[in-house]
Amino acid sequence: MRVTTSFPLGTLRDTPSEAEIISHQLLLKAGYIRRVNSGIYAYMPLMLRVIEKISAIIEKELNSIGCTKLLLPQLHPADLWKKSERWEGYTAGEGIMFNLKDRQGKEFGLAPTHEEVITSIASETINSYKQLPQCFYQIQTKFRDEIRPRFGLMRSREFIMKDGYSFHSSQNDLASFYEKVSNAYENIFKSCGLQTVGVEADSGAIGGASSKEFMVTADAGEDSILFTQSGSYAANIEKAVSLPSQPIPLKDNIPEWLETPHQKTILEVCDNNNLDPSQIIKVVIFLAQFEGEFNVPILACIRGDQHINEVKLFNLINKLNHFNLLNLKKIEDKKTIEKNLVDLPLGFIGPDLDNNTIKAISNWEKQWTRIIDHSASDLSKFISGGNKVNFHKVFQEFSFDSKDYLIGDIRNAKKGDKISVYDDEELKEKKGIEIGHIFQLGQKYSEKLNAKFSDKDGQLKNLWMGCYGIGVTRIAQAAIEQNHDQKGICWPIHISPFEVIIIPTNLKDPIQSDLTEQIYSNFLINKIDVLLDDRNDRAGVKFKDAELIGIPFQIIIGRDSINKEVELLCRTNNTKLKISTDKLLETFISESEIMYNKKS
């Protein structure tokens, strides 16, 4: 392809102000994407070629394990999502689904995911165990109404995703296929030239018994990964479990009540009373908002040197009630407190806070649900707020009576924690970008959408189901996070828009011009993915653009063309070879094969 006729590069000299991370900056500067609105981007010709190459790698690998490609609608009727009980959660409050009504007033949503639609189709087309297992996938645009779109294609409102769905006759068959997909994903990411790590993950709004995320390790990642050096354990921080450090025991001579004037934080209490945060229980107020406007006030208790993991807390609360939990928010604002609570001793709240602090006129449930982290419940003696302003109290143990009382893991695991009492290995931490997520959904959707099959004995059973996602546009940007330098992008050759770019330094020179056309034609004949920069710009402009857009190889045609010699430059390591034109094709094929075979 020629730059002048097919690929107006549209490179920028200045870094766009809205771009916060290097990959976003380079995508914009190199002309791969153009911002249309917040979280909405146009994929320019170079970017589209990258997307197509990533998609081809995905298709090849999934087809090899028996998956079948299809295309599902993006506009979904609300009725399907109401059957799965996800409509309100995805559209109300901070829900991420764009939704609308048609001319007849019927509700629809723009799909962020396709579990409902594919399960509905499966219920109509799969009726016997003889048809199982089945796996379908698609690659298409998805929509999510992000509260704060940022980082370019990392968190956008419109993006390209591969989503796949499998159906099985048994849990064992699902688990077996899940591992096949996991292995296929590892091959896909290696073929894309990425360094990834698979981690245990929370299933979130998708649901299911277990799930695994695939992370690209990068400093710009929004997710934290906790792992052991040996590789025996790795998990997203939302899911990670560990043992907290040992607490420092309280001394016996501490009085039952401590006067703590104006000491509202754990640090202030510790500094003024010669205490350690591990000896104190902090209590945090949350409101759990369930479907049907059912609001439950929560007292979450955790050791003072630890932090609450709101994802774990959400999941634990969701098990307490048969209603669908829509939202969990920390109660901190004065207006909400004054409207719903009375005589609340902020900064001095204890785990035995009286239910009478909830106002009778409030639309909250009239008793606290108390959730205690293991780090707190394991303490035989501790200090917490005394439920009186300026006072803290020494508790012997969690012995107060409450029918709404639950002990569980609501703690953030952290770097330095041990993974078990049997293992001295400590957790390490690094940042990651999620590019893939796989789930064992079980029968969550088949039960609600009546997707059944007849087994060998003629019994009707619910289908077992898995789902598998890959962020196609995320892969492209994540690849840049791992492959760039001060000059620009350094694409892995497997997903680069072109394998090589030809750069003549002076097309007005007839010798250069003729040699350029000969090389270009020869590469096309040999099915090399080649871009010719045939602009009449200065050589320096072409070199800068070539470095910025990051095509793996450059063929530079300059003054030595009179001797039928050119330079072959490798963008990744900046090595240059001066080669006679009769050896150029052979040398390029050899060098590019080395790069193709060098997967991450």
UniProtKB/Swiss-Prot annotation:
Question: What is its subcellular localisation?
Answer: Cytoplasm
User: Which SUPFAM superfamilies does the entry link to?
Assistant: Class II aaRS ABD-related, Class II aaRS and biotin synthetases, YbaK/ProRS associated domain
The signal peptide annotation in the UniProt record is none
Q: Which UniProt keywords apply?
A: Aminoacyl-tRNA synthetase, ATP-binding, Cytoplasm, Ligase, Nucleotide-binding, Protein biosynthesis
Coiled-coil-forming residues are: none
Q: Per the UniProt record, which EC number(s) apply here?
A: 6.1.1.15
For the biological process aspect of GO, one term held by this record is: prolyl-tRNA aminoacylation
The chemistry this enzyme catalyses reads: tRNA(Pro) + L-proline + ATP = L-prolyl-tRNA(Pro) + AMP + diphosphate
The reply on keyword Aminoacyl-tRNA synthetase is yes
Query: Could you state a single Gene Ontology molecular function term?
Result: proline-tRNA ligase activity
GO CC entries = cytosol
Q: Which EC main class describes this enzyme? A: ligase
InterPro entries attached to this UniProt entry:
aa-tRNA-synt_IIb (IPR002314), aa-tRNA-synth_II (IPR006195), aa-tRNA-synth_II/BPL/LPL (IPR045864), Anticodon-bd (IPR004154), Anticodon-bd_dom_sf (IPR036621), Pro-tRNA-ligase_IIa (IPR002316), Pro-tRNA-synth_IIa_bac-type (IPR004500), Pro-tRNA-Synthase_IIa_type1 (IPR023717)
Enumerate the CDD domains for this protein.
Answer: ProRS-INS, ProRS_anticodon_short
Please name the Gene3D superfamilies in this protein's record: Anticodon-binding domain (3.40.50.800), Bira Bifunctional Protein, Domain 2 (3.30.930.10)
- Domain of life here? Bacteria
Q: What PANTHER family does its record include? A: MITOCHONDRIAL RIBOSOME PROTEIN L39/PROLYL-TRNA LIGASE FAMILY MEMBER, PROLINE--TRNA LIGASE
Q: What is known of its domains?
A: Consists of three domains: the N-terminal catalytic domain, the editing domain and the C-terminal anticodon-binding domain.
Q: Which family does it belong to?
A: Belongs to the class-II aminoacyl-tRNA synthetase family. ProS type 1 subfamily.
Function text? Catalyzes the attachment of proline to tRNA(Pro) in a two-step reaction: proline is first activated by ATP to form Pro-AMP and then transferred to the acceptor end of tRNA(Pro). As ProRS can inadvertently accommodate and process non-cognate amino acids such as alanine and cysteine, to avoid such errors it has two additional distinct editing activities against alanine. One activity is designated as 'pretransfer' editing and involves the tRNA(Pro)-independent hydrolysis of activated Ala-AMP.
Oligomer status and interactors: Homodimer.
Q: Which HAMAP family match?
A: Pro_tRNA_synth_type1
For this protein, the record's NCBIfam families field holds: PRK09194.1, proS_fam_II
Protein name, UniProt field: Proline--tRNA ligase
| Species lineage | Bacteria, Bacillati, Cyanobacteriota, Cyanophyceae, Synechococcales
